[in-house]
């Protein structure tokens, strides 16, 4: 594309003309997003939940409510938008953050539909096929699941869908840059979209795009100020340049990106392949292939979408964490225009796929009555001796207890200490600030910490599980 080109890069040459049905073209994405939101609100979790890889929810909510810094890269954009969601006058605090995810996911659906509408057949926008593709994204189980819980993936999906719409509809490169920057602040994997953005932008406008990108990254500069709060959730020490770089680069998790063992690789390949097929019931991927071969999109755009989707797939495959599969959500967004192009061949029949997805997945994904975590956490906290130190064994337990103590105010006399985080100097410094009477925080020696404090406070090893493990020593 040259600098003189102003046409949307998704369209075949000669296929662009002003569509007089502009109101209809606006309503299709809007109604699609609203339909998705309605289903999300019917199935949304009413409280804190670990469902759908949601165990980070307690930490993210606590960080937002207490103006803290979440796990790397800190997620400042989520922190600030969460504060807005927390102002809602109804529902539990956790529900309000779940609602933020639902709105974010519905926004992603609306913009994915708007992007798919840019595909034209004979000069006419494929509104019906675009709506069907948007709803197929909405009811894909991986995507739907993230719309119901407190996590960053739905918000990240919203920014990525807006970015793709901006790029493929020929919007301002400044806007595209800002949106990509914000997407990166909600998940570092969004850097994968940078080559796509450059390919779909005129080279003469790259400087404007980069300026927008830097503007979108500005929330990361708020992390040193958030770290000055009294929040229990402050990862790293972003008050120094080296500490800030450690945090925003996600260096803590570099070790997770590695080759799987030979025996694990086949199992992981099967898991990823099966999960991807499930998203669109297998048959949807046939329409993606049909869309690729339809030539309704500019070849370079098709190749760029496929290449970027494959990079996300490789990233998820080699990122060795339990929730790595969720990093494939952008792939579904990227392939939505291709799905719409394939759907254009069958018209209204394309709605069969989202309808089947809705029927097949509704029961399994419905979290409307999911409140299993609250009694588990309350049992641990209520049973603890007065002013005890509770030692947790890892993220799931400490994140959950943070929420119930700091957000809901349950048992604020207790001291929460995580055994895994104790190894970090910055975490022990945070404990010193929160609990000045604690001793034994100068070195990474948990046994010495126990011995130094068990004369003043009972110490309990606790774990928030179905068994509600709690072992205390006076």
Walk through the language-model features, giving the residues of each.
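Perimembrane helix-loop-helix junctions
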Residues: 3, 7, 169-171, 192-217
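Transmembrane signal-anchor helices characteristic of membrane glycosylation enzymes that use polyprenol
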Residues: 23-53, 139, 188, 212-230, ...
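Transmembrane-helix motifs of polytopic, lipid-linked glycan transferases
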Residues: 33, 99-122, 135, 162, ...
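Aromatic- and kink-enriched transmembrane "portal" helix at the membrane-lumen/periplasm boundary
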Residues: 42-45, 79, 87, 91-98, ...
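Membrane-interface alpha helices of multi-pass inner-membrane proteins
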Residues: 62-66, 133-135, 161, 173-187, ...
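Specific aromatic-rich, kink-prone transmembrane helix
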Residues: 65, 111-114, 139, 143, ...
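Signature aromatic-anchored transmembrane alpha helix within multi-pass, membrane-resident enzymes
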Residues: 128-131, 214, 302, 341-361
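Hydrophobic, aromatic-rich transmembrane alpha-helices
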Residues: 277-300
